[in-house]
Amino acid sequence: MDQMLPSPYNIPGIDTPLHQPEEDQQILPNAMQQQHQHQQQQQQHALAAMGSSPLVGFGASLMGTPQRSVHTYAPAASYATPQQMMQPQTPQNLMSPMITSGSLAGQQMLSQASPAPMTPMTPHSADPGIVPQLQNIVSTVNLNCKLDLKKIALHARNAEYNPKRFAAVIMRIREPRTTALIFSSGKMVCTGAKSEEDSRLAARKYARIIQKLGFTAKFLDFKIQNMVGSCDVKFPIRLEGLVLTHGQFSSYEPELFPGLIYRMVKPRIVLLIFVSGKVVLTGAKVREEIYEAFDNIYPILKSFKKQ
């Protein structure tokens, strides 16, 4: 009992390693050999991809040299061409497309690149179907001579003179259909023309009539003083709501006048707005002011449209 039989199993103690140092010496050479074979395979694949590159000789010299480093570098196929033989390439996004004169795509691209042609300013409004029409133009001219109104009234056609009622000769012509107020000082006012050209033509005809009566009349300082336009917005308007919202610019007294008087600041135009949708614009010196005033007032009128 005091002597214990030897055990058939060799049980290692706490201080005994699990394998012998001889086994470590066998594992390390095997790992190095496998790593070296793996590096040679990578080099062979790289050389096969390179094909007939000028760097094949350089790769072959690498195969004969033992590799001491774990990491290897194999040049890719895209870098196989020598640097001095490469040409600078323009990036694709910076290249201009080839445009032929006969191709449809080329014509479309040219039309998009070139801006639209400039056109002269034309009257426009918030609603393209509504353009104010000129109804009356008032112009003045200086004949630069003293006039005998009684002589003019006696010898001229279509002329009337009543000094008790009005201190000017009232003369009319048919083409353009206008009326002139001729004063003894030589000043004349022409009204009733529908366009700027007609107003100037009518004033020249009146001056020619005065010349034929023996007066040394000239044609100086012709100027358009007032233009009147009108239009129809084609819908009824709530004038009560408009005067409450825009009381600073408008006045509405239906017992005195059926229209709302709207005094626009810029351009300086006075508008007469009626419940039926009719609008009268007056006070303009040029017709563009009438078009601009209507462009400004139309969205306001549309917001007060009767339902």
Swiss-Prot record:
Annotated stretches, region: Disordered: 1-20
GO cellular component: nucleus; transcription factor TFIID complex
Compartment(s) where it occurs, according to its Swiss-Prot or TrEMBL record: Nucleus
Sequence repeat placement: 134-210, 224-301
Gene3D superfamilies: TATA-Binding Protein
InterPro entries assigned to the protein according to its UniProt record, in alphabetical order: TBP (IPR000814), TBP_CS (IPR030491), TBP_dom_sf (IPR012295), TBP_eukaryotic (IPR033710)
Molecular function GO labels: DNA binding; RNA polymerase III general transcription initiation factor activity
Keyword Nucleus attributed: yes
Keyword annotations: DNA-binding, Nucleus, Repeat, Transcription
Alphabetical GO biological process terms: DNA-templated transcription initiation; transcription by RNA polymerase II; transcription by RNA polymerase III
Family: Belongs to the TBP family.
Quaternary assembly: Belongs to the TFIID complex together with the TBP-associated factors (TAFs). Binds DNA as monomer.
Function summary: General transcription factor that functions at the core of the DNA-binding multiprotein factor TFIID. Binding of TFIID to the TATA box is the initial transcriptional step of the pre-initiation complex (PIC), playing a role in the activation of eukaryotic genes transcribed by RNA polymerase II.
Name of the featured protein: TATA-box-binding protein
Organism for this UniProt entry: Spodoptera frugiperda (Fall armyworm)
